[in-house]
Each structure stands twice: as structure tokens, then as C-alpha cells.
A protein has these predicted regions:
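Hydrophobic alpha-helical
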Residues: 1-55
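Short beta-strand elements at the ligand-binding edges of bilobed clamshell
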Residues: 58-72
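Short, surface-exposed amphipathic charged segments that create phosphate/polyanion-binding patches used
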Residues: 5, 58, 81-83
Length: 116
């Protein structure tokens, strides 16, 4: 992700935001921005990891937000569906679990010491 972000920044120096597929990529994008001396571009990601929440708490961090998934809720939903299958019950072919946006304004509500 670091090399990809460096390439993007080289080809698109006026980019204003980077959206990453996960929090680890966001950290790499932030590193690439720092190496390029770019302190204006913001970074968004998906996961809601404890590390990215710590970054969100920093006033000067370019990490602007993450869409938080809940491994706990995902696991509970998976077990519920597995039990339905084992019991021969009907189940949805596709299912979803709610996610939520974390940003600098609401990260304190969720804490930075774990997953939701």
C-alpha cells in the first residue's frame, strides 16, 4: 500500500483525499503523505481498528475517518446463521451487519482500546 500511495501522489499531487480498503492501508497512505511533505490530504479507511482509532484521536493526524466494522457482531451473526442451517431453518442467502462511521468528533464515544 505504501508504494501504491507513493505512486498515486506522484501522479496526482493535488489529490485531496485517499480512501483505503482497510486501516493498514490507511497507515501506509499516511506514511506516503508524510514522506511527500503533504499535510493537506486526508485519509479514510474501513475497519475501525484500535490503531486507527488512536490516530483519529490525534489532532494533527491526516486520518479523517474509518467505517467501523464490528467483529463481535459479525461473529454473532455468523453463529446465528450457522445454527439456522444446522437446524434446517430457512436463512437469507446474503446478510449484512451494521457499520458506522468513526471520525475525530465521535471516536471518544467508542474508545481506542479495542474493537466494537
Amino acid at each position: 500500500a505504501l508504494e501504491a500511495a507513493k505512486k498515486i501522489l506522484n501522479e496526482q499531487p493535488d489529490i485531496t483525499a485517499i480512501m483505503c480498503g482497510n486501516d493498514q492501508m490507511a497507515v501506509a497512505a499516511k506514511t506516503a503523505l508524510n514522506l511527500a511533505g503533504n499535510d493537506q490530504t486526508v485519509v479514510y479507511s474501513i475497519d475501525g481498528s484500535p490503531d486507527i482509532k488512536k490516530e483519529l484521536k490525534k489532532a494533527d493526524s491526516q486520518i479523517a475517518g474509518t467505517v467501523a466494522q464490528s467483529p463481535v457482531n459479525i461473529g454473532k451473526k455468523a453463529v446465528d446463521i450457522a445454527l439456522d442451517i444446522l437446524e434446517g431453518k430457512d436463512f437469507e442467502k446474503e446478510t449484512s451487519v451494521d457499520v458506522f462511521m468513526l471520525n475525530k468528533e465521535n471516536v471518544e464515544m467508542y474508545g481506542a482500546d479495542g474493537w466494537q
